């Protein structure tokens, strides 16, 4: 055991924060991409000219993984060995990773479901496209909220 505020297991929590940021965000992005991709594939049989217009849900789902990557890289850059890496830093980094990771997971699920239904509906009624985009923006913002909170938490360990 090292100092009181810095036990030897304190970096474990930072590593778990970085891992959870990337893993959960990637899971959300993968689900959103897969679910939207299935909808685009089904829609393109009837209306192949709409493929490029309806690729937006897949792009938005991919952005969710970038949020997790940014936070994971930030946390990994601050990781250090136990005497210099405190338990406080480990817990804050874990909170930041869970914040962006779980919000990315939720956003990816929302983007996938909305994207799937939206592109299928757009194939039948093109006026639904604008509504789908608006709903996708609101789903994407869920992941952005997690990124903002994670960066805010991350900055608390800088001083």
From Swiss-Prot:
Domain of life: Eukaryota
GO cellular component: proton-transporting V-type ATPase, V0 domain; vacuolar membrane
Molecular function terms, GO-annotated: proton-transporting ATPase activity, rotational mechanism
Positions of transmembrane segments: 12-32, 55-75, 94-114, 133-153
Alphabetized UniProt keyword annotations: Hydrogen ion transport, Ion transport, Membrane, Transmembrane, Transmembrane helix, Transport, Vacuole
Main localization of the protein described in the UniProt heading: membrane
Bilayer topology term: Multi-pass membrane protein
Site entry (Essential for proton translocation), positions: 140
Subcellular location(s) per record: Vacuole membrane
Lumenal topological segments: 1-11, 76-93, 154-159
Subunit structure: V-ATPase is a heteromultimeric enzyme made up of two complexes: the ATP-hydrolytic V1 complex and the proton translocation V0 complex. The V1 complex consists of three catalytic AB heterodimers that form a heterohexamer, three peripheral stalks each consisting of EG heterodimers, one central rotor including subunits D and F, and the regulatory subunits C and H. The proton translocation complex V0 consists of the proton transport subunit a, a ring of proteolipid subunits c9c'', rotary subunit d, subunits e and f, and two accessory subunits.
Family assignment from sequence similarity: Belongs to the V-ATPase proteolipid subunit family.
General function of this protein: Proton-conducting pore forming subunit of the V0 complex of vacuolar(H+)-ATPase (V-ATPase), a multisubunit enzyme composed of a peripheral complex (V1) that hydrolyzes ATP and a membrane integral complex (V0) that translocates protons. V-ATPase is responsible for acidifying and maintaining the pH of intracellular compartments and in some cell types, is targeted to the plasma membrane, where it is responsible for acidifying the extracellular environment.
Protein name in UniProt: V-type proton ATPase 16 kDa proteolipid subunit c
Protein species of origin: Nephrops norvegicus
């Amino acid at each position: 055991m090292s100092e009181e505020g810095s036990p030897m297991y304190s970096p474990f929590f930072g590593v778990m924060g970085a891992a959870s940021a990337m893993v959960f965000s990637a899971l959300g992005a993968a689900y959103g991409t897969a679910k939207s991709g299935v909808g685009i594939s089904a829609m393109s049989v009837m209306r192949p000219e709409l493929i490029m217009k309806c690729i937006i849900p897949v792009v938005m789902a991919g952005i969710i993984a970038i949020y997790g990557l940014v936070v994971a890289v930030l946390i990994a850059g601050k990781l250090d060995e136990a005497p210099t890496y405190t338990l406080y830093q480990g817990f804050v980094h874990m909170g930041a990773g869970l914040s962006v990771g779980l919000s990315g997971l939720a956003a990816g699920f929302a983007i996938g479901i909305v994207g799937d239904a939206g592109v299928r509906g757009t194939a039948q009624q093109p006026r639904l496209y604008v509504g789908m985009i608006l709903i996708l923006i609101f789903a994407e913002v869920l992941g952005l909220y997690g990124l903002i909170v994670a960066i805010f938490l991350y900055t608390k360990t800088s001083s």
